[in-house]
C-alpha cells in the first residue's frame, strides 16, 4: 500500500502544517473504502524496478533516461507492469526509453496555459483533479517548491506513484486521493489549478469558492474548463449526456464564467486562451482500450457532439484572490 507518512513529514514545517489536523485521519478512513483493485494496482508499483535515471527532463517533457539503456527484456517487463494500470489518460511520459502514449496530449494544454502564468518558481501549488499527475511534473519542471495534487481516483494515484518511481522517487510532487470538498480551507497555496473539473460539478459556484479558500491572499487561480459560445447569460445544461459523459452539469460561456468568478469574490479575472479540442489532442492509443474523442463527435459534423451539442471547446481563465 502507498505510504503517505513522508508527505506528512514534508508539510509539518511548512504553511500546510494545519492540514495535519485532518488529513491523516481522512486517509486512514480512505484506506478502509478503497476500490477493489487498489491492492493489485499498488502492488504493480512495488513490482517496478528501482532504477536510477542519469537524466530527468521535466521542463520540456516528463522524461527519464540513463546513460546505459535498458535491455529490450527490461523494457518489456516495465511495459507489462505499466499496461496493467491502463487506461492511461493524461500524458505523454517518456520513461527509460518507454513511450507511454496516453489518450490526451496534455503537453498541448500545458503549452497553451504556461505562457500566461505568474512564474511558478518557488511556489506551493495545488492541482485539483490532477489525474495521474502529468501537469504536476511539468509544474515541478518550472521550479515549483512543492506541488500537491488531489484526485480521489485510486488508479490515478497508482499511475502517479509508478511514474514517480521511474523519476528517481522525486518528492516535490505528491498526490492525495481526496476531493477538494474534503479539504479544510488552508489559504496556503500560491497557485491553484482546476483543469477539466468544473463541468463535472453539480454546484459550480461552490467549487469556485472551494478553490478560493485554498489560495493565499493575492494567489493565482488557473481555471480550465469546457465553454460554449454565447453571452453572459449563456449556460449549457445537457439534458442527459454530453460527448457521452453522463456527469456533465454546467458548461458556461466565457462571459458567464467570468461573471461566476467575480460573483464569488475573485479579482483580475481574464480569459487568456480558448481552443477547440482536436483529434490530435485526444485520441485512441495502445495505452487506452476505451473510446475517445472521435467516438464522441457527430460522424458527419465534427463541430457537434454525438448528442448534437457544440463540440468540446476549452477556455483558460486566470484570476486572483
Curated annotation (Swiss-Prot):
Entry's EC annotation: 2.5.1.-
Query: Which top-level group of life is the source organism from?
Result: Bacteria
Reaction(s) catalysed by this chain, per the record, are: carboxy-S-adenosyl-L-methionine + 5-hydroxyuridine(34) in tRNA = 5-carboxymethoxyuridine(34) in tRNA + S-adenosyl-L-homocysteine + H(+)
Alphabetical list of Pfam families matching this protein: Methyltransf_9
Alphabetically ordered keywords of this record: Transferase, tRNA processing
**What does the entry list as the binding residues for carboxy-S-adenosyl-L-methionine?**
90, 104, 109, 129, 151-153, 180-181, 195, 199, 314
The GO terms describing molecular function are: methyltransferase activity; transferase activity, transferring alkyl or aryl (other than methyl) groups
Q: Which cysteines are joined by disulfide bonds?
A: none
| UniProt xrefs under Gene3D superfamilies | Vaccinia Virus protein VP39
Q: What class of enzyme is it?
A: transferase
Per the record, the GO terms for biological process are: tRNA wobble uridine modification
Role according to the record: Catalyzes carboxymethyl transfer from carboxy-S-adenosyl-L-methionine (Cx-SAM) to 5-hydroxyuridine (ho5U) to form 5-carboxymethoxyuridine (cmo5U) at position 34 in tRNAs.
Q: How does it assemble?
A: Homotetramer.
Q: What family is it from?
A: Belongs to the class I-like SAM-binding methyltransferase superfamily. CmoB family.
* Name under which the protein is recorded: tRNA U34 carboxymethyltransferase
Amino acid at each position: 500500500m502507498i505510504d503517505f507518512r513522508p508527505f506528512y513529514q514534508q508539510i509539518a514545517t511548512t504553511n500546510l502544517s494545519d492540514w495535519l489536523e485532518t488529513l491523516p485521519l481522512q486517509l486512514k478512513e480512505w484506506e478502509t473504502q478503497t476500490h477493489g483493485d487498489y491492492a493489485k494496482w499498488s502492488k504493480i508499483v512495488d513490482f517496478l524496478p528501482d532504477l536510477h535515471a542519469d537524466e530527468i527532463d521535466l521542463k520540456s517533457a516528463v522524461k527519464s533516461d540513463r546513460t546505459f539503456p535498458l535491455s529490450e527484456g527490461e523494457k518489456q517487463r516495465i511495459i507489462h507492469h505499466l499496461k496493467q494500470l491502463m487506461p492511461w489518460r493524461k500524458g505523454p511520459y517518456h520513461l527509460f526509453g518507454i513511450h507511454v502514449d496516453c489518450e490526451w496530449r496534455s503537453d498541448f494544454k500545458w503549452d497553451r496555459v504556461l505562457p500566461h502564468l505568474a512564474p511558478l518558481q518557488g511556489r506551493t501549488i495545488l492541482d485539483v483533479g490532477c489525474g495521474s499527475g502529468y501537469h504536476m511534473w511539468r509544474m515541478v519542471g518550472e521550479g515549483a517548491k512543492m506541488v500537491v495534487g488531489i484526485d480521489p481516483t485510486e488508479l490515478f494515484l497508482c499511475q502517479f506513484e509508478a511514474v514517480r518511481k521511474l523519476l528517481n522517487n522525486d518528492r516535490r510532487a505528491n498526490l492525495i486521493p481526496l476531493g477538494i470538498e474534503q479539504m479544510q480551507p488552508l489559504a496556503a497555496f500560491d497557485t491553484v489549478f482546476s483543469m477539466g473539473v468544473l463541468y463535472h460539478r453539480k454546484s459550480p459556484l461552490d467549487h469556485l469558492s472551494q478553490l478560493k479558500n485554498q489560495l493565499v491572499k493575492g494567489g493565482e487561480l488557473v481555471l480550465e474548463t469546457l465553454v460554449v459560445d454565447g453571452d453572459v447569460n449563456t449556460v449549457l445544461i445537457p439534458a442527459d449526456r454530453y460527448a457521452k459523459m453522463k456527469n456533465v452539469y454546467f458548461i458556461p460561456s466565457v462571459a458567464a464564467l467570468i461573471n461566476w468568478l467575480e460573483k464569488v469574490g475573485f479579482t483580475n479575472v481574464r480569459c487568456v486562451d480558448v481552443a477547440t479540442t482536436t483529434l490530435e489532442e485526444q485520441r485512441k492509443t495502445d495505452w487506452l482500450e476505451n473510446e475517445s474523442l472521435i467516438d464522441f463527435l457527430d460522424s458527419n459534423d465534427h463541430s457537434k457532439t454525438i448528442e448534437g451539442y457544440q463540440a468540446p471547446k476549452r477556455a483558460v481563465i486566470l484570476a486572483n484572490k
